């Protein structure tokens, strides 16, 4: 139930253009300080997963592993996506509170 609420909110954030998708773009946004929250697919490759988690830890950006690449892509209206960065503080805080509930 909570996971569905997360995906619904992700869809709204994507339509508001507050979501960056794709591994390299997410890493770039984390480095630039624009990413407020990062969502990572649980079926991401070890290399991609480690790279994104290390960047988030270093730059002190909260991240969560949720769903698979098809769930993340479907929630944002795109094809499969391994990583998503939320650039809006309001969406990020709401998603974070939902993800920390479960």
Model-derived regions, located:
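Solvent-exposed alpha-helical segments within well-ordered globular domains of core cellular machineries
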Residues: 8, 28-32, 50-54, 93, ...
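Structural motif
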Residues: 17, 36-37, 62-64, 81-84
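C-terminal structural segments of small proteins and small subunits
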Residues: 8, 70-102
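Absolute protein N-terminus
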Residues: 1-2, 102
């Amino acid at each position: 139930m909570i996971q569905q609420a997360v995906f619904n909110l992700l869809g709204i954030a994507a339509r508001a253009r507050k979501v960056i998708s794709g591994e390299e773009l997410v890493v770039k946004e984390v480095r630039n300080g624009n990413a407020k929250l990062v969502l990572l697919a649980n079926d991401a490759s070890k290399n991609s997963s480690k790279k994104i988690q290390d960047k988030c830890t270093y730059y002190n950006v909260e991240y969560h592993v949720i769903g698979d690449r098809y769930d993340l892509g479907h929630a944002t209206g795109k094809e499969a996506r391994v990583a998503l960065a939320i650039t809006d503080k309001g969406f990020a805080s709401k998603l974070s509170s939902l993800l920390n509930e479960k």
